Amino acid sequence: MKCIIAEKPSVARDIARIVGATHKEEGCFSGNGHVVTWAFGHLVTLAMPEAYGFPTYSRDQLPIIPEPFRLVVRQIRKGTTYMDDPSALKQLNIIRKCFDRSDRIIVATDAGREGELIFRLIYAYLDCRKPFDRLWISSLTDKAIREGLSRPADGRQYDRLYLSGKARSEADWLVGINASRALSIARGGAYSLGRVQTPTLSMICRRYIEHRDFRSVPFWKIHALPTGLSVRAIGETTYESRKAADRAMEDLDPREALIVSSVSVQTST
């Protein structure tokens, strides 16, 4: 029996149809020597600071650097605490049973760093020891899936990809948890920082401030109408006053050639 694990139910349905696993069970498909199951994104995540004995915000506890990081079922917030996501826990139990039923696993999560990490965290959390192969395809057509399943790669060939995803995940945790707690302590409130969210928010705020503070000011440019040509040449330099533009115009040598940096065409009727 082979277990194929996809990243989402829709992909699992397509794979199940192709391999002949037509019997629908809760959280999986089975048949023709295969059981096909799926994840819902990240079912397993890194534990929150509370799991390491840091339930409160304290300057003396920073930075929090877990050694090693612990894996937990995806968490949801309930009030001021976190709890296991019931849907994630239910699907993990189904995946565990699918792994137990199989002799070998085929990893069909998305072909990329995050897809690899999704499977590896599940594999580690369930303490699975079954050998696994990798379905690595860039298309989800029937032809691509069949070809990929006919020549799966040894899953261990993607160890470095997994380690890359693992490093990214742990780096996000270290930055997000420690920076959020540090700012919250310093400002006396509840603040959230992140490796991606904070720079993104900064770009939005910077653009908002630029738009808010923008003041329209007059400017001048030099225009030229070359003799015998139906074109208008516009200088690239912007002048803050008419006087400066006139002075630049007087300094032009009519014998010099113009250098064209760009051309735009406008049609009028």
Regions found by a protein language model. Give the residues of each.
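Conserved short loop/turn motifs at secondary-structure junctions
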Residues: 1-3, 109-111, 188-192, 264-269
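Intrinsically disordered, low-complexity regulatory segments
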Residues: 1-169, 173
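Intrinsically disordered or highly flexible coil/loop and linker segments, enriched in small
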Residues: 11, 104, 154, 158, ...
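Long, highly charged, low-complexity internal segments
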Residues: 43-84, 191-269
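Long, charged, low-complexity, helical-prone intrinsically disordered regions
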Residues: 97-103, 119, 179, 243-258
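Short, residue-level hotspots on alpha-helical faces of the histone-fold
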Residues: 124, 173, 177, 198-202
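Hydrophobic transmembrane alpha-helix bundles
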Residues: 145, 173-177, 221-224, 228-229
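Amphipathic alpha-helical segments of the small helical/lid subdomains adjacent to P-loop NTPase cores
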Residues: 164-194
